[in-house]
A protein has these predicted regions:
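Extracytoplasmic/secreted proteins and extracellular or luminal domains
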Residues: 139-140, 168
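Short coil/turn segments at secondary-structure boundaries
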Residues: 18, 82, 125-128, 160-163
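Contiguous terminal or domain-adjacent regions
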Residues: 1, 153-194
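Acidic, metal-coordinating catalytic cores used for nucleic-acid/nucleotide bond scission
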Residues: 118-122, 151-156
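Aromatic/basic-lined ligand-recognition segments
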Residues: 1-120
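Short aromatic-glycine motifs in intrinsically disordered, low-complexity regions
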Residues: 129-139
Length: 194
């Protein structure tokens, strides 16, 4: 965790130390103790969430070796896998495994794609969206290079524009793209994939 955070912040201790404190506080709040270790073999709920298809990771998606996390909101089903805490734990597990397996992602960051296509209002949870944004921007020991929101629900277009300066202050907000149903939007440089 510490190595990943130092790489993500380019060894800037002024940035790394508060982020490290935030991560450890977040970890204790979610898992109860720093000594707790997530494992698919011991946690059937976590395994079920990982296998649910909500989050997919694609490695080495650009010339700098960044990984892409694709979150498909239409895979979240009310009552089945919609518990915000379980989704947070699953997102943490997937992110930490990716950082461990792909050191270039530690340094160069993730590209996140949030696909809301096929999502209905009854399955939408602002809490899940907000917790994932905050977790990526404030707590996890990683850098987010670019975020693309594909096919957002109509009201989300306005909500995300208001939230992005708060969730990603400074220059990061430039890399937060909201793409509509129009395929031409994909040509507006959302992600450089090989």
């Amino acid at each position: 965790v510490i190595t990943s955070l130092l790489r993500a912040t380019d060894c800037d201790m002024k940035t790394a130390i508060p982020r490290m404190q935030n991560y450890f506080e977040f970890y204790v709040e979610i898992f109860g103790a720093l000594s707790f270790k997530q494992s698919l073999t011991n946690d059937s709920e976590l395994r079920e969430m990982v296998e649910s298809g909500i989050v997919h990771v694609f490695e080495n998606c650009d010339a700098k070796g960044r990984c892409m996390r694709v979150m498909q909101y239409n895979q979240i089903r009310t009552g089945l896998n919609s518990d915000a805490l379980q989704i947070t734990k699953m997102f943490h597990y997937v992110t930490m495994r990716t950082l461990k397996n792909y050191p270039m992602t530690q340094k160069n960051g993730f590209m996140d794609v949030c696909d809301m296509g096929g999502l209905s209002l009854e399955n939408f949870s602002l809490r899940i969206t907000r917790s994932n944004l905050l977790m990526s921007s404030r707590f996890l020991p990683c850098k987010v290079h670019k975020i693309c929101v594909l096919r957002p629900l109509y009201f989300m277009k306005f909500l995300l524009r208001a939230v992005k300066p708060y969730a990603f202050p400074g220059p990061m907000a430039r890399h937060f793209l909201i793409l509509s149903q129009d395929p031409k939007d994909l040509l507006k440089d959302p992600v450089f994939c090989r």
